[in-house]
């Protein structure tokens, strides 16, 4: 059972801004209800400007959290877009590998980069939720489906099975205090959807936000990101992808179809689709471009035998499950479940 949680801001420093304090307070009250001890790492609440200017401070927080034997779980506050800037401070002198201990690490979105860092040093992690977007949900409570998996992770330190949500929620556009207690609009959901290939397959899941993976290869957003990712061999090799299950989900930026195609093409050229046993696709926010994305997946992958399963409740569309990386997963679309060894 998780007893001590450290919250880190490895990307954008939203948690330290005044405009987010009502959300932080909500989240802390909910965590208190679990009976866990919560600490913000020293730089986690220093705000957007400071953390943007000081990636070394973000890296220091992560290293300190791993080195502290009293911390059971590292919970990311939120994503962002520049956590790649931590790479030199975590790998130049093998700092991360020497610091890592067996703790639960949970985050998503830009935290995809941190998951790849931790995969590189051999730590299994958990993808799918974060403090501000999930624990600090402005409604009367955490979204029930989201809460179910968060609770399981806190109580057991793992996730044993994932099934689809009965509903999906419209994304919020207003995070002001006026929205406290107001639940997001809900719609019936359709379960896991088999786009192509066998309905059953297995392997260790690895992946994350496709927008972030695009930036691994393309320097339009940050010119030095592809350079640093290559320097530190951050993107897994084709051999590393062999036998795994690729997870892809889209961000709140609602990636345009032409960029989605380009991102898939980068992954294809890296040998990912030839190596993996299957692909899992998270539901897009508000289901925007859903059908176009499916068409592009079929076209770019160009292998009808490779299983592709869509409409998972993972990533930027609410509610969110949690998927373990680094443990064997068995996907069964007919039974509508993913089980973990």
Where are these regions (language model features)?
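Long, hydrophobic/aromatic-enriched structural stretches that serve as scaffold segments
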Residues: 67-91
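Short, acidic/small-residue loops that bind anionic groups at enzyme active sites
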Residues: 92-120, 124-133, 307
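Buried hydrophobic positions in well-ordered alpha/beta secondary-structure cores of metabolic enzymes
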Residues: 7, 74, 110, 213, ...
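Oxyanion-binding "anion nests"
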Residues: 205-250, 255-257
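Structural motif
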Residues: 73-75, 106, 245-249, 280
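ATP/nucleoside-binding phosphotransfer catalytic cores, i.e., glycine-rich phosphate-binding loops
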Residues: 259, 265-268, 278-341
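ATP/NTP phosphate-donor binding region
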Residues: 1-70
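Conserved anion/nucleotide-ligand pocket segment
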Residues: 124-211
């Amino acid at each position: 059972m998780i007893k001590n949680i450290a919250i880190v801001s490895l990307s954008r420093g939203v948690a330290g801004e005044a405009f987010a304090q009502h959300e932080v307070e909500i989240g802390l009250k909910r965590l208190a209800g679990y009976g866990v001890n919560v600490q913000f790492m020293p730089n986690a609440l220093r705000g957007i400007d400071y953390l943007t200017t000081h990636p070394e401070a973000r890296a220091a927080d992560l290293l300190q959290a791993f080195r502290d034997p009293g911390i059971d779980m590292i919970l990311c506050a939120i994503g962002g877009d520049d956590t790649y800037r931590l790479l030199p401070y975590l790998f130049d002198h093998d700092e991360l590998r020497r610091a890592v201990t067996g703790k639960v690490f949970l985050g998503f979105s830009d935290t995809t980069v941190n998951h790849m860092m931790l995969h590189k040093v051999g730590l299994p992690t958990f993808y799918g939720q974060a403090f501000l977007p999930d624990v600090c949900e402005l409604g009367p409570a955490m979204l029930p489906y989201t809460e179910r998996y968060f609770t399981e992770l806190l109580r057991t330190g793992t996730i044993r099975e994932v099934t689809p949500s009965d509903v999906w929620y419209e994304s919020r556009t207003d995070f002001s205090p006026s929205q406290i207690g107001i639940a997001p609009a809900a719609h019936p959901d359709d379960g896991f959807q088999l786009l192509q290939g066998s309905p059953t397959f297995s392997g260790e899941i690895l992946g994350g936000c496709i927008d972030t993976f695009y930036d691994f290869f393309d320097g339009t957003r940050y010119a030095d990101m592809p350079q640093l990712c290559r320097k530190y061999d951050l993107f897994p090799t084709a051999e590393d992808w062999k036998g795994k299950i690729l997870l892809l989900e889209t961000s709140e930026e609602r990636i345009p179809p032409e960029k989605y195609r380009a991102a898939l093409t980068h992954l294809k050229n890296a040998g990912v689709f030839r190596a993996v046993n299957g692909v899992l696709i998270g539901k897009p926010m508000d289901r925007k471009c859903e059908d176009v994305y499916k068409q592009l997946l079929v076209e770019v992958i160009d292998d009808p035998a490779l299983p592709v399963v869509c409409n998972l409740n993972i990533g930027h569309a609410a509610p969110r499950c949690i998927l373990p990386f680094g443990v064997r997963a068995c996907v069964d679309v007919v039974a509508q479940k993913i089980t973990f060894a």
